[in-house]
A protein has these predicted regions:
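Helix-loop-helix junctions that connect adjacent transmembrane segments
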Residues: 74-77, 106-237
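Short alpha-helical transmembrane interface motifs in multi-pass membrane proteins
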Residues: 2, 13-15, 81, 128, ...
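TM-loop-TM module centered on a large, flexible mid-protein loop between adjacent transmembrane helices
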Residues: 32-33, 39, 70-71, 177-249, ...
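Juxtamembrane helix-boundary/capping and inter-helix hinge elements in multi-pass membrane proteins
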Residues: 25-27, 36-41, 165-173, 180, ...
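Transmembrane alpha-helical segments of multi-pass small-molecule transport proteins
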Residues: 3-5, 72-97, 108-119, 283-292
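Hydrophobic transmembrane alpha-helices that form the core helical bundles
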Residues: 11-86, 90-94, 99, 240-261, ...
């Protein structure tokens, strides 16, 4: 139910946001749209909501990346891997939009191929009874609690708008970008949800056998229940890394532009508004975002931070809707 609600919400939102992005191709996204429509005070609220999302989603993804790599490199702490990821991908984005976007395209294609492989392995074992549509042990409060996690299927798709200012023919290409992104995410959302939960129930992709602690690697866990070759389990784990990298790099890319535009209006430290003259990238904004993200990582509460940031983002954006 939570997933169905989120799909409808994001389809409606994306259509509206695409129209604004094409009409106002600015790096600030929601901040610039609200500034023109409702003035600087409401623009501050919308811009802050956007930056909260862009600042606090990457730490959770970085820690997930660390947890995945820790399966292959158990001698390295996940936190060290997460901080290293921040340094590496912030560096890639500082090199400029062409480098960052080209890298993003490659890792995204690999990640999509991985999800398609997972679906091909799992869907033959799908049973609709495993989805348990009629069982709601927590009632609608459970559905409400699941919404922030369902949002992760589409999180930060609005970041497409933040690169509109650097896009050739944005009225055409931003439309194509948003449309293809939404179509891809909806299809992959259905495939991934159905082929994971639908093979043995949600418990089998959350809790490892004999444990009550939630796993950070649900797709390999799902394949283990099917007793497929360990080769495929490892391969899906590697593809999962590419998915996390694609999400992480994509949000860093959009976040740098959003913070830069926010700073141009005096709402963030002025140095964050500066563009690197050599690479033509918002280097200072990217570094500022990285520092905040690493601090969030060091708190050890990235899951709680992202859940609360999504809730507060919705609260901040509601007056602007």
């Amino acid at each position: 139910i939570a997933l169905a609600f989120v799909i409808v919400m994001y389809v409606c939102f994306t259509f509206c946001y695409t129209e604004m992005a094409c009409a106002i191709p600015k790096a600030g996204g929601a901040f610039d749209y609200v500034n023109l429509a409702m003035g600087k005070n409401w623009a501050f609220v919308a811009g802050l909501a956007q930056i909260i999302e862009f600042l606090f989603a990457p730490p959770a993804i970085a820690l997930g990346l660390g947890a995945y790599l820790n399966l292959f490199l158990p001698q390295i702490h996940p936190l060290i891997i997460a901080i290293s990821a921040y340094l590496i991908f912030t560096g890639i984005n500082i090199l400029g939009i062409k480098t960052a976007a080209s890298f993003e395209l490659v890792v995204t294609v690999v990640a999509v191929l991985g999800l398609l492989l997972f679906a091909a392995l799992a869907l033959p074992h799908f049973s609709i009874s495993n989805l348990e549509f009629g069982k709601m042990p927590k009632g609608f409060s459970g559905v409400s609690a699941a919404v922030p996690f369902a949002i992760w299927f589409f999180l930060a798709i609005e970041g497409v708008a933040n690169v509109a200012e650097e896009t050739i023919n944005p009225q055409r290409n931003i439309l194509i970008g948003f449309g293809s992104a939404l179509f891809t995410l909806v299809i992959l959302c259905f495939l991934t949800f159905s082929s994971s939960v639908g093979i043995a129930g949600w418990e089998k992709v959350v809790f490892p056998a004999g444990s009550q602690q939630a796993s950070d690697s649900p797709l390999p866990l799902a394949l283990q229940t099917l007793q497929v070759s360990p080769y495929f389990v490892t391969l899906i784990g590697i593809f999962g890394l590419f998915g996390l990298v694609a999400s992480f790099n994509g949000i860093i890319l959009a976040a740098g532009r959003a913070t830069m535009e926010f700073a141009k209006s005096g709402n963030a430290p002025k140095p964050a508004a500066m563009v690197n003259q050599k690479f033509k990238s918002p280097a200072n904004a990217l570094i500022f975002n990285m520092v905040i993200g690493i601090i969030a990582l060091l708190t050890g509460k990235t899951g709680e931070i992202i859940t609360r940031s999504e809730e507060h983002t919705s609260e901040l954006q509601s007056p602007c809707n």
